[in-house]
Regions:
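Short, well-ordered coil/turn segments that N-cap beta-strands
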Residues: 42-45, 86-88, 126-130
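Active-site cofactor/substrate anionic-group-binding motifs, chiefly glycine-
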Residues: 60-85
C-alpha cells in the first residue's frame, strides 16, 4: 500500500504532461491529504485562557470577539473541553485587578495570585492530562503596563531579572 501511495505521489508531482497537472492532485479531499506537506490538528494547538478574579464569571473581551475571561472556578469546563479535543496545553494569562498593580509588579510574587490559583486548580483536577504554560512577565502586574521596572522611562533590565527569577 505504501509503495502504491508513493508511486501515485511521484507520478502526480514528477510526471510529464498530461500526467503532471497539479490540479488533479487537489481535486478530491483524499488526494489533497495524500500530497499535503503538513497537517494541523487539535494536538498541535495551545489554548490561551484569560483569567479574572471572582466566582462563576465568564466575561467577554471586547477587543477579541468570541474570546472570554474566566474565573478560576470556571476552568473545569474550559480545560475539560480542551482535554476532550486532544489539546495538549493551555496558556494562562491574568487580567489583574488595578488595585493589585504597582510599579514593581509585586502581585507577580504572590503565591496566591490569579495565575498560581489557576495552575493549582488545573493540576488538582486534571493531573498530567494537560500541560500548563505561563508567561514569566511583569506587565500584567505593573501599574505602568511595562514588562519591566522603570526609571525615568527606561527599563531596568538587571533589576527586572531579579524579580522575574523569584
Amino acid at each position: 500500500y505504501n509503495t502504491f501511495v508513493a508511486l501515485i505521489k511521484y507520478n502526480m508531482i514528477t510526471g510529464k504532461y498530461p500526467s503532471l497537472r497539479l490540479r488533479r492532485s487537489r481535486k478530491y479531499a483524499w488526494s489533497r491529504r495524500l500530497v499535503q506537506e503538513s497537517s494541523l490538528s487539535y494536538s498541535d494547538l495551545i489554548l490561551p485562557i484569560f483569567l479574572i478574579e471572582g466566582k462563576n464569571k465568564k466575561e467577554s473581551i471586547k477587543s477579541m470577539p468570541n474570546i472570554f475571561r474566566y474565573s478560576v472556578d470556571k476552568l473545569n469546563s474550559v480545560v475539560g473541553k480542551a482535554v476532550k479535543k486532544g489539546i495538549p496545553m493551555v496558556a494562562l494569562f491574568p487580567h489583574t485587578n488595578t488595585k493589585k498593580k504597582d510599579e514593581y509588579g509585586s502581585e507577580a510574587l504572590n503565591p496566591n495570585n490569579l495565575v498560581c490559583r489557576g495552575i493549582k486548580f488545573i493540576k488538582k483536577k486534571f493531573k498530567n492530562k494537560i500541560g500548563i504554560m505561563c508567561d514569566v512577565a511583569l506587565d500584567p502586574y505593573t501599574s505602568h503596563g511595562h514588562d519591566g521596572l522603570l526609571k525615568k522611562r527606561n527599563i531596568l533590565n538587571d533589576e527586572t531579572l531579579e524579580i522575574l527569577t523569584k
